[in-house]
Amino acid sequence: MKYISILGASGSIGTQTLDIIRSHPDEFQLTAISIGKNVDMARAIIEEFAPRLVAVAEADAYEKLRSEYAGKVKIVFGEEGLIEAAAFPETDIVVTAVVGSVGLVPTLRAIEAGKTIALANKETLVTAGHIVTAAAKKHGVSLLPVDSEHSAIFQCLQGEKRNRVEKIILTASGGSFRDKTREELKNVTVEEALRHPNWSMGAKITIDSATMMNKGLEVIEAHWLFELPYEQIDVLLHRESIIHSLVQFRDTSVIAQLGTPDMHVPIQYALTYPERLPLANAKPLDLAEISTLHFERVDFERFRCLQLAYEAGKAGGSLPTVLNAANEEAVSAFLQGRIAFLTIEEYIERALERHEFVNEPSLEEIREIDAETRRYVRSLL
């Protein structure tokens, strides 16, 4: 039996993790969760899975749940509550499925508590990869990727030595607007942006997919997860999202991981690693039915956010923190209808250009840079 905490239980990754726990009651038990403000969802999870601890981000939701479950479930609040859920003593694996940089400190505390990390919050490594990976090594903790692309690379590298790797290739669908010109992108709507052709995901990551910032963040995450320089990390457009990523070795051999676009697969693999279990209600891959797979080179002028991510990643230091914070604020403004789609990349670039570089920022400096960048982007609105 593995005991699971889910940070971000009401989101897309969180709810799919619950599906897996539900499907394998003899393998997994839910011990702790965090939610934002969805009281009904929290009630449903408590009634079905009986977690020992529930962390709540929003004050009104916290007060409601605390009064309802007094003496039955420990209800905790805010960042301290999130940290408590992450480091819960009875937990073996922490699924970090919260969105954004809010996941950084709880992930570090979970690592310090010796928990295995099922990493779905890519911003943790983007903003503080040097700190997180050093902490994981110090405490002997595994960082198991949940992103489909990183899970694919992780699977392709099983039994292989890193010095055999020529490069890794992350595939990208191209998102909602892959066939639109730059001119057409000027007037796209939020509703259009949220229609991803292949994957069912949360709003923020769907917009990131449309701008290709999601792939840029994944490039930075891959740099830290697999300890490879950016020159050995490529991106390939692949419309069908069947090949989730590839590894090319020094002898020119290529190993790829294939599957239908279903996030249950990489989530379950992170929970069961190194074992594999049957996946309930999964559609097996039928290549004859699909018949044809397509691949294209990435146009970095077309996908400016991906270029910005490569540049920030290669520069390192504090720039990835600025990249991430500026992107989060700009995407939020776009989702609220306050800025145009292409203004997202404009605000990110402006934030990067004005930032005073810090080479190896401390955790406190990262938090200050994150907050200052957010204030700057909000001032542009």
Curated annotation (Swiss-Prot):
InterPro entries: DXP_reductoisomerase (IPR003821), DXP_reductoisomerase_C (IPR013644), DXP_reductoisomerase_N (IPR013512), DXPR_C (IPR026877), DXPR_C_sf (IPR036169), NAD(P)-bd_dom_sf (IPR036291). It is an enzyme of class 1 (oxidoreductase). Mn(2+) binds at D147, E149, E218. 1-deoxy-D-xylulose 5-phosphate binds at K122, S148, E149, S173, H196, S209, N214, K215, E218. One of its GO terms (biological process) is isopentenyl diphosphate biosynthetic process, methylerythritol 4-phosphate pathway involved in terpenoid biosynthetic process. NADPH binds at S10, G11, S12, I13, G36, K37, N38, N121, E123, G202. Pathway: Isoprenoid biosynthesis; isopentenyl diphosphate biosynthesis via DXP pathway; isopentenyl diphosphate from 1-deoxy-D-xylulose 5-phosphate: step 1/6. Keywords: Isoprene biosynthesis, Manganese, Metal-binding, NADP, Oxidoreductase. Its EC number is 1.1.1.267. It catalyses: 2-C-methyl-D-erythritol 4-phosphate + NADP(+) = 1-deoxy-D-xylulose 5-phosphate + NADPH + H(+). The keyword Secreted does not apply. HAMAP family: DXP_reductoisom. This is 1-deoxy-D-xylulose 5-phosphate reductoisomerase. It comes from Geobacillus sp. (strain WCH70).
